[in-house]
Amino acid sequence: MKVLENVNVALKANVYFDGKVTSRAIYVGGQKQTIGVVLPGEYEFSTTQPEQMQVTSGSFEVLLPGESQWQTFAEGSTFNLDADVSFSIRATDVAEYLCSYL
């Protein structure tokens, strides 16, 4: 299990899609990241700045901007997103992620 040390955690969760996706802001060395949980379902998100998403548990499919085919990302894999784009996530089981803002 990977552990993030010396982390500050926001106490209030970000809750999306009627609680089916939740995340918390964390601060590592002053850099904001979010850790989150995705319950089964399909969800569309938008970015405001470049992001790197790392799947930390389970897996989910992602429809990246400009793509027509879903791609599966399993635990330990990452994908990058530009600012001001939309993308979709489809999960069949519970999955977790770490989002780093680039």
From Swiss-Prot:
Keywords: Glycosyltransferase, Transferase. It catalyses: a purine D-ribonucleoside + phosphate = a purine nucleobase + alpha-D-ribose 1-phosphate; adenosine + phosphate = alpha-D-ribose 1-phosphate + adenine; cytidine + phosphate = cytosine + alpha-D-ribose 1-phosphate; guanosine + phosphate = alpha-D-ribose 1-phosphate + guanine. One of its GO terms (molecular function) is uridine phosphorylase activity. Its EC number is 2.4.2.1, 2.4.2.2. SUPFAM superfamilies: RmlC-like cupins. It holds the Pfam family Ppnp. InterPro entries: Ppnp, RmlC-like_jellyroll, RmlC_Cupin_sf. GO terms for cellular component: cytosol. PANTHER family: PYRIMIDINE/PURINE NUCLEOSIDE PHOSPHORYLASE (PTHR36540), PYRIMIDINE_PURINE NUCLEOSIDE PHOSPHORYLASE (PTHR36540:SF1). HAMAP family: Nucleos_phosphorylase_PpnP. Belongs to the nucleoside phosphorylase PpnP family. Catalyzes the phosphorolysis of diverse nucleosides, yielding D-ribose 1-phosphate and the respective free bases. Can use uridine, adenosine, guanosine, cytidine, thymidine, inosine and xanthosine as substrates. Also catalyzes the reverse reactions. This is Pyrimidine/purine nucleoside phosphorylase. It comes from Shewanella amazonensis (strain ATCC BAA-1098 / SB2B). The lineage of its organism: Bacteria, Pseudomonadati, Pseudomonadota, Gammaproteobacteria, Alteromonadales.
